[in-house]
A protein has these predicted regions:
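Conserved catalytic scaffold of divalent metal-dependent phosphoesterases
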Residues: 14-121, 157
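Conserved beta-sheet core of the metallophosphoesterase superfamily
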Residues: 11-21, 104-183
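Conserved beta-strand segments of alpha/beta enzyme cores
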Residues: 18, 49, 153, 186, ...
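A general structural motif
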Residues: 45-47, 92-95, 134, 184, ...
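Accessory, non-catalytic peripheral segments of nucleic-acid enzymes
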Residues: 179-269
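Hydrophobic/aromatic beta-strand patches that form the interior of the parallel beta-sheet core
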Residues: 20, 51, 97, 136-138, ...
Length: 269
């Protein structure tokens, strides 16, 4: 919840870390000041301004009269207000960065990880709401690392860890962005080591006899139990198989692996 996200703010502020979990509004309008934060260099100088926009619920956004998509258009309007507020603070040589927890048009979602964000009749927002004054847009929600529209300055860094078996082949990383004044000088990707492996056996669903043979042939190195891989087993069935788990566990007997999920799909026999 927004309140839970902001609960540790007093502690985190001691380390110059800031959490913005919700939008505050009053009769006078939105509190744009809390959405626009200075980013300081080691010497204390402000090097950039950040539009720290949290996930926006329908009740968080401005009401747009005669809007075709009230929620999406409200989000875009609030971003425009916050960006203009940041531009008013920005001085020469300072970059402008925007954050967003949203699904932009053209972004690729995982098979079974992200919650679907439905914005009125549309599911995605246009990247055009970030105009050329915004030097870099750091996006969250989609777990696959990706650029939007082929623009390296509008991107999802992706999840640093796999959050489902569908993300096994994703590049899990942290993206570091360097600026020279207001100019983006370098974007570097740093892979996150994976301490526990995820396995899919087989890589594509197969019949039960093929799956059991593959599990029996599974050759894994011995390691501490806390480092055993998590395993997803993928089986094609023609009818329900009551002893499916028993057969799979028997094939895995004595192997250093943790059975996390059995995925079944049905085909006509």
């Amino acid at each position: 919840s927004p309140g839970r996200l902001e609960a540790p703010s007093p502690f985190l502020s001691m380390f110059d870390a800031h959490v913005v979990g919700q939008v505050i509004r009053s009769d006078e309008g939105f509190s744009l000041e809390r959405l626009v934060l200075p980013l300081k260099a080691k010497d204390g100088r402000i090097g950039a301004w950040c539009v720290a926009m949290p996930f926006l619920r329908p009740s968080d956004v401005p009401r747009i009269e005669d809007a075709t998509e009230p929620y999406a258009e409200g989000i875009e309007a609030l971003y425009r207000q916050a960006i203009e507020h940041a531009k008013a603070k920005r001085e020469a040589g300072q970059a402008l960065i925007a954050l967003g927890h949203c699904h932009l048009t053209g972004g690729k979602a995982s098979e079974d990880s992200e919650r679907r964000i439905v914005i009125g009749g549309a599911e995605a927002l246009s990247a055009e709401m970030f105009d050329d004054s915004v030097t870099y847009v750091a996006l969250g929600h989609l777990h696959l690392s990706q650029e939007i529209g082929g623009d390296s300055t509008r991107r999802y860094s992706g999840s640093p860890l796999p959050l489902s078996f569908s993300e096994i082949d994703y590049p899990h990383q942290v993206v570091i962005v360097d600026f020279d004044g207001e100019v983006l000088s370098r974007i570097s990707e740093h892979k996150v080591p994976q301490s526990v492996e995820l396995l899919r056996v087989p890589s594509s669903p197969a019949t039960l006899d093929v799956v059991l043979a593959a599990l029996s042939d599974l050759d894994l190195p011995e390691r501490h139990e806390a480092e055993w891989p998590y395993l997803q087993v993928r089986v094609h069935l023609t009818e329900p198989e009551p002893s499916l788990r028993v057969q799979i566990e028997a094939a895995l007997q004595g192997k250093p692996v943790r059975l996390a999920r059995i995925e079944t799909s049905y085909v006509r026999g």
